[in-house]
From Swiss-Prot:
InterPro entries: PSI_PsaA, PSI_PsaA/B, PSI_PsaA/B_CS, PSI_PsaA/B_sf. Belongs to the PsaA/PsaB family. It is an enzyme of class 1 (oxidoreductase). Phylloquinone binds at residue 702. Signal peptide: none annotated. This is Photosystem I P700 chlorophyll a apoprotein A1. Residues 1-22 are annotated as: Disordered. The keyword Nucleotide-binding does not apply. One of its GO terms (cellular component) is photosystem I. The chain crosses the membrane at residues 76-99, 162-185, 201-225, 309-327, 368-391, 407-433, 455-477, 551-569, 609-630, 674-696, 734-754. Divinyl chlorophyll a binds at residues 693, 701. [4Fe-4S] cluster binds at residues 593, 602. Residues 8-22 have a biased composition (Basic and acidic residues).
Amino acid sequence: MTISPPESGEKDKKILESPVKADPRPIDFAKLDKPGFWSSKLSKGPKTTTWIWNLHADAHDFDVHTGDAEEATRKIFSAHFGHLAVIFIWMSAAFFHGARFSNYSGWLADPTHVKPGAQQVWAIVGQEMLNGDLGANYNGIQISSGVFHMWRAWGITNESELMALAIGAVVMAALMLHAGIFHYHKAAPKMEWFQDVESMMNHHLAGLLGLGSLAWAGHTIHIGAPTAALLDAIDAGSPLIINGKEIATIADIPMPHQLCDPQIVGQIFPGLASGTGNFFSLNWFAFSDFLTFKGGLNPVTGSLWMTDIAHHHLAIAVLFIIAGHMYRTNYGIGHSMKEILDAHQGDPILFPAPRGHQGLFDFMAESRHAQLSVNLALLGSLSIIISHHMYAMPPYPYIATDYMTVLGLFTHHMWIGGLFIVGAGAHAGIAMVRDYDPAKHIDNVLDRVLKARDALISHLNWVCMWLGFHSFGLYIHNDTMRALGRPQDMFSDKAIQLQPIFAQWIQNIQSSGVGTTLLEGNGVSQVFNGETISVGGKVAMTGIPLGTADLMIHHIHAFQIHVTVLILLKGVLYARSSRLIPDKASLGFRFPCDGPGRGGTCQVSSWDHVFLALFWMYNCLSIVIFHFSWKMQSDVWGLTGGNFAQSAITINGWLRDFLWAQAAQVLTSYGQSISMYGLMFLGAHFIWAFSLMFLFSGRGYWQELFESIVWAHNKLKVAPTIQPRALSITQGRAVGVTHFLVGGIATTWAFFHARLFGIG
């Protein structure tokens, strides 16, 4: 029972009375002048060119810097503040560009005709051509980050507010940098504080998520929603009247501090002026004008209702504040994670592990890599979920009709999700090699999974083969039939139908369920019920029909996802040992081969599985974003004449009607304001091709070449003092996959932007 009284003496723990150690590690500026100071070997400086690569590989590998887990954890904690500082500086730069160089006011006044821009190119060598006409007498580079739409949702109405945010973000960055230094050098937390996971969960749930959502709900209720109501009324041509004055322009909108005056805001939302008496008397219906449950999209802006968003964040806040009181800390009540896990037994037939989840709490609490792995897997999955919500339920005003921004945000969150999930596999592998102690995991669920790994991997391999041959086979069949002039024998909506009946059922229950649930919304997202919302003559959202083409490409998605998982899971389950290399754990997380004399043992390290999974992740997500791009252009935005259903059922159709037809804009971009995307398209192809040099050739080839070049230098008496050394096998693969991914991503970036900017 997890709410049992505390063990004798449990309340007497003094961790919180002294959670930090004072002055544990004084600042040593001499170290900063010595690259690789954490390693006696690296700190001696370079003898060969391998030194710089080892420096990169180990700079952030705190495990190898010191054998002290507490010290490594403190470095991670301090680095988090550094990361937050970088984020605040990045945010400040965005705010500053918005305040100083953008056309935000012009866009805010006419968001359906003016395009967002936040950068103007200086006419130094004639590149001012890149400044396109974005409307309202502004020439600049069109942006697709969605910040203008987000700022409007926040309630920002002028550049002065953006400049204040820019200054505030820089101040926050300085505070974060100070905090990072302070909590490593002056007052560093003790290991007991890091290990107090119940306190951590309570504070993260109630503080970060609960109070964070409550604060945002407060801002949305008092500033965001009233400002949005005034702006929406202006855009709809029926401005509101406050204190007898018509709010006809943005300049007429009250300042944020004025909106906190009940007398003013009560004319927009009477519920906001009704006082707190209704709250304490449980007459919450009085607040239903600014805490709504409308559902669907605002027809003026094509986005979610701001009052729905405020209600959502208030509900989230309540949930997480309650959740933040769930775990047992000082008061002897609540859950203990260790007790929950130690007591948990799996199904006796499916998961007959005699010791259940015993040992998992300690493994998760002590292994930073295990924690990071789980967090990356969850956050990566969440990012992919977000990418779908961004277009189906567009949260920011007018973002749904900024097609490049919709496509860009979908693509961005997909890439982030994929990288995080591969990162989860990487750190799970590191955890198995460095942190897993088999003696502590005898017959628990982790041990049983490792013992069943052959069955798991062989079955997963069979699933991959089945999905691959069948899904690809459908395309081969269709290409063959179309090539032979037999459309009646193709899998298509007009011939042999393969309808995605389960997906269609899920779509239907979204709309049929309205009015039958406990929380009765007034509508449902247009993505499900087939209605069309147009804003400024452009489709913001309409029903998305699914057919044979979607079923076929979805099975390609399933195939590629399963292969990515197969590679990652094999890398984790065989990280410590395999039949081929029983002592793999002693070789570490990354190694090229199992030494000389053991042929056929290369590319078996856990790191190499991550390397291979990155390619599959990249290919998988390329098909996902291509599917999304073409589907939206064809069936929602009305840009390609609805050709997806008939063209996407053959490989030739994908090559001809998607890649080739839609590359017209980037290939003919020279001489236009989008010409930089043409240059980027070529340059990124070069970076991608450059990667193949590292991926296709071995270390010996290059070392042999270097020996010849060094000989020539010696003859001329210009030999380098640092000996040239070919990249190691692992280093070469790392450089190769990095350029492969960067080149591929930047190529796609240029392709998408030129396409949607080019057709306006």
